[in-house]
Amino acid sequence: MSIFKDKIIESLKSVLPIALIVIVLSITIVPLTVGDMLLFIVGVICLVIGMSLFTSGAEMSMQPLGMKIGSTIGASKKIWIIAFVSFIIGIVVTISEPDLVILADQVGDNIDNMVLILTVSVGVGIFLMIAVMRIVFGWNLKYIMIAFYAVAFVLSFFLPEGFKTLAFDSGGVTTGPMTVPFIMSIGAGVSAAKAGADNRDDSFGITGLCSIGPIIAVMVLGIVTQVEGSGPPPTVTPEVETSRDAVLTYLHGFAEHIPDVAIALLPTVVFGVLFQIITRAFNKVQIIRLVIGIVYVFVGLTIFLTGASVGFVPTGETIGTVLAGYHYGIPLIPVSMLLGYFIVKAEPSVYVLNKLVENMSAGAISGKTTGFGLSVGVAAALGLSALRIITGLNIMWIIIPGYIIALGLSFFVPKIFVGISFDSGGVASGTMMSAFVLPLCTGACDQLGGNVMTDAFGCVALVAMAPIISIQLCGLAYKLKSRSRVRRFVMARETFVDYGYTHSEQRRAAAENRRRGGGSNE
């Protein structure tokens, strides 16, 4: 019970800043109706409860199941089994990812939803296979990233304009609440089964690699079909005048999302059952814990998605529309940055990432460090997205230089930060981006008379890119700080020798120096 209480407190810390920003906006420059505000407040409550249940359930079920599957296939001597199982897992977990379904609904009628979802799922399957092979054979992550992003940039020159933003957004939304816990745990499991000193570093980067697959797959789809999305249909905001209306609206939302979440969980559950039948990897107590965890995930994700879609989608669109009407849309930039800094903290997958980072780095890299890097990166990304909506700037003028910087930084930061940064990019662009930020951008774009597919779409892609840079900058600072500590330690030892201290005195002084922060963390 105390664990769930801690989860509630964590969720409150994440969601309340967003709620306060929206409330301040609603009583100043973005007036909301009483009905819309009521839906939003209930949505905040749903997000807090849903996130708490989801993160608790993911720790009980998705993570241990993924770890066990990863360690099992990682221990296999048959490469074709590792490759085939990884490919199937990638498709199975992605095909019903809620974030992907939300994006597909936003694209419009010109592109069939199921065609887009299947294309993205196959892309994830192929690149999960590549990611696992990288861990098994010890391939260098940065060179793989450089090669495949180069392929994506070349393909982008042959795409219709509207498909460029869609392709990069697809890479962002794929790594959502269903895929991240499972895929990252598989990476950790495969890495744990691999002997060698670098297995900790190799466990990161798997989500980042899986984000490239949908980008390239959707680009190929665009080149073949040569069509563009028509954009999202207008949001129909329910008329809410009484508390009864709000309750009925949310009950309708729950009814819609229960089957969606059940379908999203079903492939993972079926795969887990088959895995248990074949391997007998879990005992009875562990199986009961897994089942309880899956129930938590189901209930939590249903509540979370309902709160996001009913309470946050219309609010986001209203805020975007109103802000774009002030002073040529200039206020949209600072407000977007402020929202971006806090909204990433409300992503369920971010908690999973932070927890794994702390565990796999043995506490050397704290969740706070990762969270700060994510927040700064997302704030910058949404500021650039708002600038694009106002000016109509082509996304490739930001994407190409941004990834050149990100890939260039990978040569100067510790290896573990490279993998964490690319994982962070995929994790940051989750449910809240699809359910709140994308409607905000489309509302602003409509108000300014822009093209939704070329100007509003692409915000998720920028959100996925910016943390890659900001986390690596944190890694660069970590590296420089560690070097400084080493230099101070060496200078201290030289001083002891110069003044004729005995060996035991030198050791005691060196230990004291480390205790005060002068030692190396490397």
Q: Which residues are covered by each model-predicted region?
A:
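Alpha-helical transmembrane segments
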Residues: 128, 132-136, 163, 188-202, ...
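Hydrophobic alpha-helical transmembrane segments in multi-pass integral membrane proteins
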Residues: 158-166, 217-226, 304-311, 383-384, ...
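Helix-loop-helix junctions within the multi-pass membrane cores of secondary transporters/permeases
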Residues: 70-72, 79-151, 329-410
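Small-residue-rich segments of transmembrane alpha-helices in multi-pass membrane proteins
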Residues: 18-22, 50, 78-86, 147-158, ...
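Signature of multi-pass transmembrane helix bundles
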Residues: 1-56, 71-72, 76, 171, ...
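Transmembrane alpha-helix boundary signature
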Residues: 31, 55-67, 92-103, 161-165, ...
